[in-house]
Amino acid sequence: MKKSNRTFSRALLIMMVLLNAGIFSCSNPKDKNKATLSSNSVNIQISYPTAQGDQPLDGRLIFLISKQIDKEPRFQLRDDSKTCQGFGMDVLDWKPNKPLQFDSKAFGYPIRSFDSLPSGEFFVQAVFHKYETFTRADGHVVKLPMDRGEGQKWNKAPGNLYSTPKKITISNGQFPNLTLKLDKKTPPIPQPKDTKYVKHIKIKSKLLSDFWGRDMYLGAHVLLPKGWETHPNVKYPLAIMHGHFPSDFGGFRTTPPDSSLKPEYSERFKVEGYNLTVQQEAHDFYKTWTGPNFPRVIAIKIQHPTPYYDDSYAVNSAAQGPYGDAITYELIPYIEKQFRGIGEGWSRFVY
């Protein structure tokens, strides 16, 4: 056991050294100048105008620093060695035109403090992730970010405030004084449109609304079998896809792959032209789904994000509430009634 602990500790130490050696993707690996910043040398003032709302806000304020500008810094913070730099603070009762300040004591990722940042040219941006106050049925009052149709992605959540990226220079360890205005707001996410085969539904859950003390919703993307509309008296089994938050019923494409599409490399799967493969597989699935020998069933992908995460894992829990019951006794019966499911336990399959 002691040997195992030593091995783990050594591996962890090596990993931390490697991560910090990279200085995140927004720095230049050749720049080793990390002059120490004095305790009073960081002064970053961030505020939002009254035009963004006149009520005090609760949430998380995130300050981002990136070397790259091919996309905004808010889309470059990630959980690997290619991340940009971020600093964050929890915020309560923040009023418009009242600046909040990041100073040298702010906690950062992946580099702990402003003191250790390298010199060079960077792009900075601030984002405010809004929280709501939930008065729950179990007596707890919590402040959390409500999902707004994005699948719990703080950098895409509608209604969040953010600033225009700004170029700065850190010279000889001196971080410039900054004043940033959160003058932009993330727009609503367009809802997917119904097609012949794919439908989209959303219901209010009484069970979840009672638990969370506000209106709570469940949704689903519904894939209908071939012949569904021409056989109005037929009832179908239900195949339930349980996974993370789906924005649509992906992997199903009625048209052939786009012949003008240029191959793209997938960093996740280490495959060149993965985007072409995705389109081809989606079209192949459509042909199989509508083929003469494929079983006629209804398939669904459910949307059940919580204030904590992009999905509830479809179970009841003390922390998240009765999601298992809400899906089983509210969402599934509603779908089966709307789209002529058989509605029996033996006719349902989770995959």
Where are these regions (language model features)?
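Bacterial lipoprotein signal-peptidase II cleavage site
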Residues: 27-33
